[in-house]
Swiss-Prot record:
This is Conotoxin Ca11a. The cysteine framework is XI (C-C-CC-CC-C-C). Residues 20-42 form a propeptide. Belongs to the conotoxin I3 superfamily. The lineage of its organism: Eukaryota, Metazoa, Spiralia, Lophotrochozoa, Mollusca. It comes from Conus caracteristicus.
Amino acid sequence: MKLVLAIVVILMLLSLSTGAEMSDNHASRSATARRDRHLSPKAWPCGGVRASCSRHDDCCGSLCCFGTSTGCRVAVRPCW
């Protein structure tokens, strides 16, 4: 009888700890989704070729910013 009671208590504790981990993971996922939504292309649009830019992050993909007058361009080397 004591053995059965001990097993039941252990299983209850395991289910409680697993439930806490699942809720923590859910909170982490929702925070990640919120961050991704704020950093989505709609929130931070990038520019294509000849788009106005002031830094490399303003240009899409492998394009680099060559100043406000030149804009985003394809570079032979990685952006510096």
